[in-house]
Amino acid sequence: MADLGAEDKLKQICDALRIETLKPAEDEADAIVRNAKEQAKRIIDEAQERAAQIIASAKEEADFKLRQGESALAQAGKRSLESLKQAVENKVFKESLAEWLDNALADPEVSAKLVAALIQAIEDKGISGDLTAYIGKHVATRTVNEFLGKTILAKLRGKGVAVGSFVGGVQLKVEDKNWVLDLSSDTLLDLLMRYLQKDFREMIFQGS
């Protein structure tokens, strides 16, 4: 039961830290959406024109078919419009967000701050163990170590950070418990997509 309690604490730490990483992202969200909206305008215009044609054609067919009790074509038009919206969302919004996130996480100081925050968080929860900190594979370990300083480095296995298999962000592993606190770029992108997706849809597709 003690291990279960510790695992619950670990989950709470991960959730709390991930929420903290969303705060600066919220400040960036408006700029991301504005940029995405500019990039998406041409695609959206074409998509809406195409969707309108599909729906108009479907409705014409449906007027006839409905007399026979069939409405499948009208529904197909609506599904086509939704598919086009999703294509724009994935192409423009996700790519813009991923680019911003990659740029932010490429900064060695950001990686150092994330590592320090994770270590401080587990210490505050009374969790201890042999720690390994992994950073993105394109971030310089020496620079991150310099930002961390001797006090924090002394708490890490090998007295420094290691290179992970992910692009950006960090992971902290409690070796003896085989726990991993994951703030890697893929994890953060997934969280940000879910956090900002509704606002993006409302702004881009308003009235469509």
From Swiss-Prot:
Entry's InterPro entries?
ATPase_V1_Esu, T3SS_HrpE/ATPase_suE
GO molecular function terms attached to this record: ATP binding; proton-transporting ATP synthase activity, rotational mechanism; proton-transporting ATPase activity, rotational mechanism
Q: Which GO terms describe its cellular component?
A: proton-transporting two-sector ATPase complex, catalytic domain
User: What keywords were assigned to this record?
Assistant: ATP synthesis, Hydrogen ion transport, Ion transport, Transport
A Gene Ontology biological process annotation? proton motive force-driven plasma membrane ATP synthesis
Which superkingdom is the protein from? Bacteria
Q: Which family does it belong to?
A: Belongs to the V-ATPase E subunit family.
Q: What functional role does this protein have?
A: Produces ATP from ADP in the presence of a proton gradient across the membrane.
What name does UniProt use for this protein?
A: V-type ATP synthase subunit E
Organism ancestry: Bacteria, Pseudomonadati, Chlamydiota, Chlamydiia, Chlamydiales
The gene behind this protein is atpE
